[in-house]
């Protein structure tokens, strides 16, 4: 996404209105849009498509196609040297991002859930032929703290981990994000729950609901960040660190 385009988009992070779920012929409007736009979408490598299919079948949460498209476009145009992903899952998004950065660039991804780590290790070993991806195992907060304390810097960060922890991760994210670097945060709409009042969501989701709103407010209020919110996929923010 070019700078000229980004500056045309309002920097507010107020929740957008819920999408129109009007059904036409039994299918939601956005579903029909997805089918239509698929024919014009830049297709990823065959193994990425296969990983996506496997994840859907096994109900492993991965980034949605609209989010994937934005990530790919931004990475191809920005050409970051060092990319950090918080939340690896099975390695789908890490490998997709790897396909869209220069061969000389490096990508570090963090995951702590052992079940996902098993598949992530397998997929990265199999498909990362150029050895661009480094998988760090452990709690994201602890790993981020260590990265910051050892002086690591990243010019592109993708956050797709535990939604209720985004706000806790933010200070460390700011430490490792370079001046002019970009932070992309996924799932900010939390399946639409974020649009509801606190009492409009289930009790078990209220903590995440509140913390996500606090996180969005923090992004909006930080003078060192220029942030936009986009209602794509499950919602995402794009923040640039201004220095």
Give each language-model segment a name.
Residues 1-156, 163-184, 188-243:
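A short alpha-helical cap/connector motif
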């Amino acid at each position: 996404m070019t700078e000229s385009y980004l500056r045309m988009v309002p920097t507010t992070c107020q929740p957008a209105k819920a999408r129109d779920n009007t059904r036409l012929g039994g299918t939601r409007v956005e579903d029909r849009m997805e089918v239509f736009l698929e024919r014009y979408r830049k297709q990823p490598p065959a193994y990425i498509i296969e990983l996506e299919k496997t994840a859907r079948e096994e109900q492993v949460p991965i980034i949605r196609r609209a989010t994937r498209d934005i990530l790919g476009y931004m990475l191809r145009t920005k050409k970051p040297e060092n990319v950090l992903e918080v939340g690896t899952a099975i390695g789908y998004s890490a490998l997709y991002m790897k396909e869209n950065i220069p061969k000389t660039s490096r990508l570090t991804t963090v995951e702590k859930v052992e079940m996902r780590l098993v598949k992530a290790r397998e997929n990265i070993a199999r498909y990362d032929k150029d050895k661009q991806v480094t998988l760090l195992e452990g709690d994201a907060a602890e790993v981020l703290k260590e990265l910051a304390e050892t002086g690591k810097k990243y010019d592109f960060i993708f956050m797709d981990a535990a939604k209720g922890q985004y706000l806790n991760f933010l200070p460390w994210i700011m430490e490792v994000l370079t001046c002019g670097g970009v932070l992309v945060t996924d799932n900010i709409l939390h399946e639409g729950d974020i649009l509801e009042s606190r009492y409009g969501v289930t009790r078990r989701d209220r903590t995440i609901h509140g913390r996500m709103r606090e996180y969005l407010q923090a992004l909006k209020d930080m003078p060192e960040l220029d942030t936009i919110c986009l209602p794509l996929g499950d919602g995402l923010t794009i923040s640039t660190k201004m220095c």
